[in-house]
Amino acid sequence: MTLAAGPAEAGDVLASRARELVAIGARMDARGWVPASAGNLSARCTADSIAITRSGVHKGRLEAADIIEVWLDGTPLRAGDRPSAETQLHCQVYERLPAAGAVLHGHSVAATALTLADNSPGIVLEGYEILKAFPGIATHETRIVLPVFDNDQDMRRLAAAIAPAFAAPPIGYVLRGHGIYAWGEDVERCFWRLEALEFLLSCECERRRMR
């Protein structure tokens, strides 16, 4: 029989996730992926809850108190806490992908500019050695399409537009003029995949500039 974590244990889990997200926020900031109050970061706490950044905080200067816990419907466990405006998109990933342990979202120059310059519904990534950074890919002779969705301030409508993509889960997706959403089994592996995606989009920007 599996016993539910008691308050002390639950608090320890949130504190651990907060330390991880504070550290990752600083690394993302060092890369220029989370300017001003941009981006949002989360990690799974339990089967039914996640730790996520508060709304409106700079991700490069996070403190433990900036990480709060919410249920998978986005409701904060503690009254008065205000999670990221995009909490619903994080919750969608955890609900659709039970193996996901972390979700990271940034606003890089490459992801923003590339998707505004091209109105296509996806970015083709082919022939890159770094594609092998993603699960199940063993050769550069691979072609994948990174989905791009039009940005929308209505999170319910945006989540509904994204939902069909999880029928065959992509390695991540991009919101047009906004940024990448990436996920992984834990915070470190999620960062690894975000880093690979950011590198690939930077390469695509350079290729198009050189044409």
Curated annotation (Swiss-Prot):
Keywords: Amino-acid biosynthesis, Lyase, Metal-binding, Methionine biosynthesis, Zinc
EC number(s) from the headed UniProt entry: 4.2.1.109
A Pfam family recorded for this sequence: Aldolase_II
Gene3D superfamilies in UniProt: Class II aldolase/adducin N-terminal domain
Disulfide bridge partners, by residue number: none
Enzyme class, spelled out: lyase
GO MF term list: aldehyde-lyase activity; methylthioribulose 1-phosphate dehydratase activity; zinc ion binding
Residues at which Zn(2+) binds: 105, 107
Cofactor note: Binds 1 zinc ion per subunit.
Keyword Coiled coil attached: no
Cellular-component GO terms for this entry: cytosol
Ribonucleoprotein among keywords: no
Pathway in which the depicted protein is active: Amino-acid biosynthesis; L-methionine biosynthesis via salvage pathway; L-methionine from S-methyl-5-thio-alpha-D-ribose 1-phosphate: step 2/6
InterPro entries in alphabetical order: Aldolase_class_II_sugar_metab (IPR050197), Aldolase_II/adducin_N (IPR001303), Aldolase_II/adducin_N_sf (IPR036409), MethylthioRu-1-P_deHdtase_MtnB (IPR017714)
BP term (GO), one: L-methionine salvage from methylthioadenosine
Cofactor: Zn(2+)
NCBIfam families: PRK09220.1, salvage_mtnB
PANTHER family to which the protein is assigned, alphabetical: 3-OXO-TETRONATE 4-PHOSPHATE DECARBOXYLASE-RELATED, FUCULOSE PHOSPHATE ALDOLASE
Function: Catalyzes the dehydration of methylthioribulose-1-phosphate (MTRu-1-P) into 2,3-diketo-5-methylthiopentyl-1-phosphate (DK-MTP-1-P).
Similarity-based family: Belongs to the aldolase class II family. MtnB subfamily.
Protein name: Methylthioribulose-1-phosphate dehydratase
Source organism of this protein record: Acidiphilium cryptum (strain JF-5)
